[in-house]
A protein has these predicted regions:
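Basic, low-complexity intrinsically disordered segments
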Residues: 1-158
Length: 158
């Protein structure tokens, strides 16, 4: 049986299968990430509406965070700070978008939070999100590119 592993056809076949598995895993991660961002958008939308309509303040958000953490102890991301970040995420984009904008929906949540903290215009956030997707930037690289004013260099190249 081990002799087969030395044949070129076999090595090509196993390589093709491994590549297919890796591609499928990458798509699954992206799908999960996109769904999480949709969840965070919806939570942010609800928090925004409740705070405007019911004048709920930070004490209510604090209690929600505690209740969510108790209900989902193995899940991260439901701290008071995270809930406020979800509201900020929604509030930042909702004047122009009804759903999570496409390039942003392909980014990890940490990247999104970095952009919201460091970039003030929707247009620039979308530019950085697209660049992250195209170039596969880590969060550290994204932060560096923002500090180096990547958007100005790209603007000069266009």
């Amino acid at each position: 049986m081990s002799e087969i592993t030395h044949h070129t056809d076999y090595r090509q076949a196993i390589t093709a299968i491994k590549q297919r598995i890796q591609a499928s895993q990458a798509r699954a991660v992206m799908a999960v990430n996109a769904e999480l961002l949709n969840l965070y958008w919806d939570i942010g939308r609800q928090l925004d509406a409740w705070q405007r309509e019911r004048a709920w303040g930070s004490a209510v958000v604090e209690q929600m965070a505690l209740d969510l953490q108790a209900s989902y102890p193995r899940m991260k991301g439901f701290s008071r700070t995270s809930l406020f970040a979800m509201r900020q995420f929604y509030a930042f984009f909702s004047p122009q978008f009804e759903v999570v904008p496409q390039p942003v929906g392909q980014m990890p949540w940490g990247h999104v939070r970095t952009l919201l903290a460091k970039v003030k215009s929707v247009e620039l956030v979308l530019l950085y999100a697209q660049a992250c997707f195209e170039h596969g930037w880590s969060r550290t690289v994204l932060e560096w590119q923002i500090e180096q004013r990547f958007h100005e260099r790209v603007g000069q190249a266009v």
